[in-house]
């Protein structure tokens, strides 16, 4: 009897196993109504930068499988509810340590049917506040940060404004509106971010109107506070900032390149100025980048005989000043130890900068932390020429298909799209390919007529901005559009009313970015 009982129990267990096996089969004929097709809810998931777990429900009459196309997004199948034919799918997302928003696609299948679920996770970099943590560090080298910075916009004619008659004096913070009428606000900077710009270049005067002690080159603390306030507007908006020492009355950019320049004294003064700036921004993270000068040697590079100083001598003189800038910043330590710094080529002229292998003249204690700066306003007859001259006329029309009836107003074909492309390619070969990103610190062209007055001119402006933007980005250069807030000329944004003023320029930049591809 005991043997028979054991035998019947074994048979019963086998039958139960058979039933369980069938219940997991493709047809699933167990309890509950038949289910047609495959239904998946929700069809999208979003995660914070910290990641976490969420679930998806898949209802189908057949077995469900799921897969993810991203390693950071993992899916696991739960136990199916027999009566409802619902299979839970657990989605686990890792913390995002990158600086970009990322996406993944989950594919859910049941038999021949499949559905997809989109997964989005916010970027991992948290928004810095106006008073960054002093213990913060610099996460990116020059190459890494460069691809996060394009396109760029200039807060032009603002913090660099004033009069050279006030050099080595202190005249207060009112100079911000000396050349244009609008005080910079947080709302303006947020609007700049909304237009798609990722970084802001802040041209800045220090010597010209903001020195309280000439011997020590002491910067007016009120001026420094105002500069920090604007920089913080940008950092709060997750915009990168390039802060420079601009023309600044020409005390260095002109006077430092004359035949009789007191080079040693100029280097001492530059060191004192940049030491103060570096100390003031020491705790800011890598959203803040320093640029030593602006257009060094422009208008001041003359020998005693009245001829332009030879390019190699200009580059060597400039290297002395730039080295003083680099050493001053690094000596302040903290985040400045590894902060990315921007040095300028001779006159920020592309050909002169490439020709002299300029960066080989500089020494930084850390590799991969320098960028090169040049400016681009070519061809001059189209971008900036203010009146016809005996040697040539102003060009109103530029680019493929933009030809006017007056041949004298059409740009020479040697200076259209291919010229821009080739100039940017020179920078890639000389610098970017050798680990030194480039910023086109300024580029711009004057809108000569009211928008709508001359459609071919409108198309030319848009084409030029698009070409410079796209060819720069394609070659690893960050383009910064020059903007003066003057209502005409090179003005993109109406800062008083916080709106786009010149749609030709803005559209050109936007289309240029869309057409471009960063080279690495």
Indicate where each model-derived feature is located.
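A short beta-strand micro-motif common to beta-rich folds, especially ectodomain repeats
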Residues: 99-112
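Acidic/histidine-rich helix-loop elements
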Residues: 156-184, 212-219, 261-262, 381-419
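An active-site-proximal structural segment forming one wall of the substrate-binding cleft
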Residues: 179-200, 210, 215-247, 251-292, ...
